[in-house]
């Protein structure tokens, strides 16, 4: 990743933060991750000085966008119980996966109150996906939206969240 531009590294950091906060289970955010903590390119800083391992709180202002996205994703996680299943059986029953071009991860979480689709594009490529019917878009790379989308353009290093609260599609409906 060192050869990537700073912009690409920031996009990846935002997407990876989303992956942590939108995964089932208890999310673990390493100290300073929300403001792109750096250890100056050193691979293992366990025995390094406090100068290397300290939290540089000035980065919070520099990376405010990641801080804000972290807050938004925590809010979304709190608002949607389907993102907080505790039991393996619940995950197996309510979560299904699909892929787009074998590069983009898309998963659906559905119960009697929520019908949610989450898309992660970890590549530098653009993709598109068309749903059978329009879905309410609630989050696109840090922007909170509230519009219906049938066809979505999936930007590089992006996170996209769709949700229909209090809605259940009939059993047997295709993903």
Where are the model-predicted features located?
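Active-site clefts of carbohydrate-active enzymes
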Residues: 1-5
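Carbohydrate-interacting/catalytic domains
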Residues: 6-10, 21-29, 33-175
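Short, acidic/polar
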Residues: 12-17
């Amino acid at each position: 990743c060192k050869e990537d531009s700073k912009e690409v590294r920031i996009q990846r950091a935002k997407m990876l933060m989303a992956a942590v906060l939108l995964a089932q289970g208890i999310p673990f955010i390493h100290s300073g991750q929300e403001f792109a903590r750096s250890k100056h390119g050193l691979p293992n800083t366990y025995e390094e000085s406090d100068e290397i391992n300290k939290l540089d709180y000035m980065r919070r202002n520099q990376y405010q966008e990641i801080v804000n996205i972290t807050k938004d994703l925590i809010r979304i996680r709190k608002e949607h119980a389907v993102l907080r299943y505790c039991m393996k059986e619940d995950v197996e029953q309510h979560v299904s996966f699909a892929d787009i071009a074998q590069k983009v991860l898309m998963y659906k979480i559905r119960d009697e109150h929520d019908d949610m689709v989450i898309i992660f594009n970890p590549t530098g490529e653009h993709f598109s996906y068309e749903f059978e019917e329009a879905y309410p878009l609630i989050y696109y790379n840090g922007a909170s939206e509230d519009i219906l989308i049938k066809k979505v353009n999936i930007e590089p290093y992006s996170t996209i969240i769709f949700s229909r609260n209090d809605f259940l599609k009939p059993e047997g409906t295709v993903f």
